[in-house]
């Protein structure tokens, strides 16, 4: 609910005028991460550039700009001990005005689901979300989409882009 509320903040507020450049946001992210890879590769991953080309050819039509956190997942929130609710979102240094689907994709990427087998890469981040009483990724994304009246048509693209950016940055060396 907090992420949907963030994405509903009007982007035409004067205070947000210098926060970001929403034009070609996704395209710039692809270019940025491929550039990082070209300049700072630690190991050879030639498939990454093929994937980058595919991403460039398949960028979804831009969504309406939104205020985005840039690193939204449970580890960047403060939760209530008494109730299942998020009290605050922290770690704002990547906040900008851009494509809100990037935030949703990152949240889903780090969200565990006890119903499925997960790769071990994010097991520590998924410790809370993998519990049996916690909503699934599908339910979580559906709740966000319903709150904002936005479709979830291209989530696989955005999740692919985020895994690509992680690989480009050699996050999992």
Give the residues covered by each predicted segment:
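Active-site Asp-x-Gly
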Residues: 67, 73, 80-145, 149-154
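Metal-dependent nucleic-acid phosphoesterase active-site entry motif
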Residues: 72-73, 164
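Single conserved hydrophobic/aromatic residue that forms the stacking wall/gate
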Residues: 163-172
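A cross-family kinase active-site recognition segment
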Residues: 1-49, 53, 59-66, 94-100, ...
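Amphipathic alpha-helical segments that form well-ordered structural scaffolds
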Residues: 5, 54, 139-143
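Alpha-helical scaffolds flanking conserved acidic
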Residues: 154-160
């Amino acid at each position: 609910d907090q992420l949907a509320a963030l994405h509903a903040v009007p982007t035409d507020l004067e205070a947000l005028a210098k926060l970001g450049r929403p034009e070609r946001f996704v395209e710039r992210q692809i270019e940025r991460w491929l550039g990082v890879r070209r300049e700072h590769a630690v190991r050879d991953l030639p498939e990454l550039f093929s994937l980058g080309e595919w991403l460039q050819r398949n960028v979804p039509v831009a969504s309406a700009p939104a205020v985005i956190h840039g690193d939204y997942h449970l580890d960047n929130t403060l939760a209530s001990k008494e109730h299942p609710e998020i009290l605050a979102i922290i770690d704002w240094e990547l906040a900008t005005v851009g494509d809100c689907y990037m935030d949703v994709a990152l949240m889903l990427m780090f969200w565990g689901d006890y119903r499925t087998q997960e790769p071990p890469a994010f097991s520590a981040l998924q410790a809370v979300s993998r519990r049996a009483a916690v909503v699934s990724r599908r339910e979580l994304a559906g709740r966000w989409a319903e709150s904002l009246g936005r479709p979830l048509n291209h989530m696989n693209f955005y999740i692919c882009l985020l895994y690509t950016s992680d690989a480009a940055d050699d996050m999992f060396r």
